[in-house]
Amino acid sequence: SKGLMRAHFSEVKKQKEKLKTIISAQTKNRHLGLIRIEFSRFAHRLMDWDNHCASFKHVGDSLKDCGVIIDDNPKIVTQFVPYQFQIKMAEQEYMIIKITDVE
């Protein structure tokens, strides 16, 4: 990944469209209130925590665009918990996003 600051707007658009396609295919859930998000990344190389958290930017925007969450701001996302796990094969990288409604 080229990172958030270095990505050309057309590349960002492609990344978000791909994420929205994946999200739309995997869930029809809607979270209409306060939420907790657990963001787990399984990758060959671990990131610094600031980069790992920043890598959620396009995911959060796509979740909002797909209507899964109403917003990705701190008034709605009351808890954001990042996890990362190192795996052996770069070809098998994936992420898991767990969204829990908060009362």
Which residues does each PLM region occupy?
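Catalytic phosphate/metal-binding cores of nucleic-acid and nucleotide-processing enzymes, i.e., regions
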Residues: 1-103
